Amino acid sequence: MKTQHPLTNPNRRTFLRTGLTAAAATTIPSFGQTPGKQAPLAFFIISDTHVTAPENAPDTLDPHVQTINRRLIDLLNSLPGTTLPESMGGGLVRTPRGVLHLGDMIDSGDKGESPLSIQRRETEWKSFTADFGLTGNEGRLKFPIYEVHGNHDSVSIQNNVINGIISRNKLRPGVTHISKSGLHYSWDWNGVHFIALGIVVGHNDKDLPIGRYKAYDSLQFLKLDLETRVPNKETPVILFHHIDLLRYTKPCGPDSEKNGEWSACDVTAYHETIRHHPVTAIFHGHLHALRTEHWNGKPKANLTEKSNSIPVFGSRASGAHGANRGLFYCLVENGALTIREYACLNETDGWKPGTARWENQWTIPLRRKS
């Protein structure tokens, strides 16, 4: 197993090879609470489950993908109470408050609007909601789930998945703020503020270069949420969305990617919105690969200074096809956020008992200097 330890002022190449910088832990008072020791907070993060209905049998499920996803759920249910290896700090895995899903829950939401595609999408979404549930009481998963949509859920059409998330948000445990569109939402756990921002962060205004994915005014929601839910800039904030952002951190201008996955102008506006807020970390999926980076709003090639930058974590696919799968176990304790990766590598038949192990660990301060 590989353990990634805190570093002191690493250069970029060293950072990308060995993990994120950690700082000394201090107890951070949460918004609306008096200063004091916070109760530990645990949660899981998964991504890219790609529940699949085959094209030749749209009312059924791909048995291989279904098996892997159900193994994933059973693993999530069984991890709490197990012992962490000493290289990961030892102790027991705590019971999570919930599971964050970084998008691409299903597979056929990008396949168009033919009757066949619609049938596949409906079969997949019905299976996802049946297995993953919502509050921890309805499905196979025993914990509440907090999902955002990815490009395989919907590209730009308000389909059954988008409408399903909107309906689920009204019943999702602990949610305190929902966007005007009904799609984006936020909540608080143990003094930490979480914001679910959909596929990308943007506003899709006509006067800006438009990425191909509809943002449903997620940028406006982010601004409003930070202004009204974190007004004193003391509460640690965790953001999550589907698409990775470092590739699209480029100068905003007429030549920005008009047909790319994410408008460079929207990415610029995203960073401008959050750079003076205490964002602890950003999580994304999409790439089906582990990514650990820092983001300071500058193009990737210029990213050499780590101070005042935001840690960004990209998750491996948790389901789907391929040979490598992973999930994050996150623990907030003593003023720090520790992210541990549990992964099943080089196994096409993923998550079989005994094939996964603890692979990586990062510790970052809960409150970043803004």
What label would you give each PLM region?
Residues 12, 35-67, 144-146, 175-265, ...:
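Metal-dependent phosphoester/phosphodiester hydrolase catalytic core
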Residues 46-47, 99-103, 146-150, 239-241, ...:
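Active-site neighborhood of phospho(di)ester-bond hydrolases with catalytic His/Asp-centered motifs
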